Amino acid sequence: SVGFKAGVKDYRLTYYTPEYETLATDILAAFRVTPQPGVPPEEAGAAVAAESSTGTWTTVWTDGLTSLDRYKGRCYHIEPVAGEENQYIAYVAYPLDLFEEGSVTNMFTSIVGNVFGFKALRALRLEDLRIPPAYSKTFQGPPHGIQVERDKLNKYGRPLLGCTIKPKLGLSAKNYGRAVYECLRGGLDFTKDDENVNSQPFMRWRDRFLFCAEALYKAQAETGEIKGHYLNATAGTSEEMIKRAVCARELGVPIVMHDYLTGGFTANTSLAHYCRDNGLLLHIHRAMHAVIDRQRNHGIHFRVLAKALRMSGGDHIHSGTVVGKLEGERDVTLGFVDLLRDDFIEKDRSRGIYFTQDWVSMPGVLPVASGGIHVWHMPALTEIFGDDSVLQFG
């Protein structure tokens, strides 16, 4: 049949199927493809589908031992990007059976593992994923979600306020705790470890945990409110990370924190499971995200990393500020903020949402506006993010 001769063959013979009707259980991906000169877009799109599923560069006899039609990724639609020359959006459908249940790690290994170094492509960006209910239901999702968090904190109808303790590196644990107390006593709901505060020589993690817990309880007693400090549990090994989370639980604090991209999705999912089992909230920082999402034509858009985090598990995630940036960015940011919080999000290309996403009652994640914001930004922030958000100053 076509496409099964010996030698190097065109991917589009097998993997470009414009007549394909997507299934409700398929994982759908939208890639922004920039082919090398002379490579037709159909071939580039099919190459992406092939390399991220069952394809290899030639036909091998073991292909006959399985059903390619059942397991292959399919490029089912290609459209040029308006206003860009030689850029196309390639839509790829992956059969559900290609992925291990409950593993964001495996999902990314399959979809973006190999294909980004591909010779036929000058650049490639994963713009969006549609996660079908059949797959999202194999994930626990956020440890608690927005509603449970508000119940735990007894704080309703407003954004939560936080700040990061500065200078982020160099304070002793005792002085760090002092700063935490002053901030919480002054009226903030949360204070935060900086993402690079782990366990350095000038402040070991256990000392910090103890002094922060003391600050927390003192501020709680004096204000009559529930307070939190995001204790950064990120560590060099997953076991050490869980050890720190256990310590936080034993101290009775409400929330811990993790750098999910540098720590990795496997570690993050383990921590999220621990947090749900033990009543800890989980604050997620996105350190390293710009390495992956900053280039417009290559990498992975943050909305995909945000969806992955909602599946892997986290109660808060940093999601940019919008303030003072371009207007277009505002709509795109609001698009993935909705993907984090809402249950059902309609396809809306103007906001960068390529697929309708149904989370089938998976708990939501609070977006955190953080980085370079101050009190003059408050009106804009409340208008943009609404009540269900964390405004993180400092």
Curated annotation (Swiss-Prot):
Catalytic machinery residues: K166, H285
Record-linked InterPro entries: RuBisCO, RuBisCo_large_chain_AS, RuBisCO_lsu_C, RuBisCO_lsu_C_sf, RuBisCO_lsu_fd_N, RuBisCO_lsu_N_sf
PROSITE patterns noted in UniProt: RUBISCO_LARGE
GO BP term (any one): reductive pentose-phosphate cycle
Modified residues (N6,N6,N6-trimethyllysine): K5
Molecular functions (GO terms): magnesium ion binding; monooxygenase activity; ribulose-bisphosphate carboxylase activity
Positions of the record's site feature: Transition state stabilizer: K325
Location in the cell: Plastid, Chloroplast
Any single Gene Ontology cellular-component annotation: chloroplast
Signal sequence coordinates: none
Pfam families membership: RuBisCO_large, RuBisCO_large_N
Broad class of where this protein is predominantly found: plastid
Catalytic reaction(s) noted: 2 (2R)-3-phosphoglycerate + 2 H(+) = D-ribulose 1,5-bisphosphate + CO2 + H2O; D-ribulose 1,5-bisphosphate + O2 = 2-phosphoglycolate + (2R)-3-phosphoglycerate + 2 H(+)
Cofactor: Mg(2+)
E.C. no: 4.1.1.39
Amino-acid positions noted as binding Mg(2+) in the UniProt annotation, renumbered to this chain: K192, D194, E195
Gene3D superfamilies named in the record: Ribulose bisphosphate carboxylase, large subunit, C-terminal domain, RuBisCO large subunit, N-terminal domain
Keyword Chloroplast: yes
Keyword Metal-binding in annotation: yes
Cofactor descriptive note: Binds 1 Mg(2+) ion per subunit.
Coiled coil: none
NCBIfam families: PRK04208.1 (NF003252)
Note: The basic functional RuBisCO is composed of a large chain homodimer in a 'head-to-tail' conformation. In form I RuBisCO this homodimer is arranged in a barrel-like tetramer with the small subunits forming a tetrameric 'cap' on each end of the 'barrel'.
Its biological purpose: RuBisCO catalyzes two reactions: the carboxylation of D-ribulose 1,5-bisphosphate, the primary event in carbon dioxide fixation, as well as the oxidative fragmentation of the pentose substrate in the photorespiration process. Both reactions occur simultaneously and in competition at the same active site.
Protein name: Ribulose bisphosphate carboxylase large chain
Source organism of this protein record: Nymphaea odorata (White water lily)
